[in-house]
């Protein structure tokens, strides 16, 4: 199991010697006894969050971590049904959410997908395990800290049913409420609202309209605009394609791909076509355990995995395979992610062939 280490390049020079000594202690800890291990790690690292328990002054002067650029590790995350440790929902899950990549949590119903993202987003505390991003660690049963609150403010969560997170009677209020609470704008800042509505493809929508009157696709976009208006750096989406038509799904995919350079994105989905078009990495859960962590291309090209777990390949992979079996090879086959890409490749292929007279 990975042991956290304090990153010296993120803290002031005068604390380097103290941090080096702490890293030596961390390296010597025995990780076999999990509960005592977490408590000891927490005790060693915690002084580096604050100067003392009374003054909430960050040691690192806002350089504790770069949430959109530092990898986020989760280590031995386990969640039980209750405090008596009856039944595990997720079991010893470890992995990494990389920056500038879209990661999908994939698996059958009841595999623990939603439970895992609630741990990654700090919405629930794990029974065991910890999350580590640069010099920030979040442990099972850890008390709320100011730095944890600051970390949470950078995380946006979009529910499967977007309307479940609507609280206001107008689109303008819905977009601005979270941002106003964080003091990022004032209550009737139309320009601020339109900036994020435009970003999400809602540039022509009336601001006085009730969010409930929107289509399912528009509701998803409004929920996304409301979250982005809070300037989050870590975006979590739970089954974002449910209820959307193909055009809305395609637009959502393009939007998320464009955002990934500035926002860490994690998606829970069982829509294999959307996953193949949108994501870079896949974490496959089965009965609460992670069984695969790999690139999306590698996952869907492994026919034995797909057959073993009863997964139907994306339609575009089936179409490309059909062309290959007919003797048609594509120059940029690895880049074919959707129907538009396939049509473009076919046009290029046949435009290069000389006409037969």
UniProtKB/Swiss-Prot annotation:
One of its GO terms (molecular function) is ATP binding. It comes from the Bacteria. Residues 72-312 form the ABC transporter domain. Keywords: ATP-binding, Nucleotide-binding, Transport. GO terms for cellular component: ATP-binding cassette (ABC) transporter complex. ATP binds at residues 107-114. Belongs to the ABC transporter superfamily. This is Putative ABC transporter ATP-binding protein MG303. It comes from Mycoplasma genitalium (strain ATCC 33530 / DSM 19775 / NCTC 10195 / G37) (Mycoplasmoides genitalium).
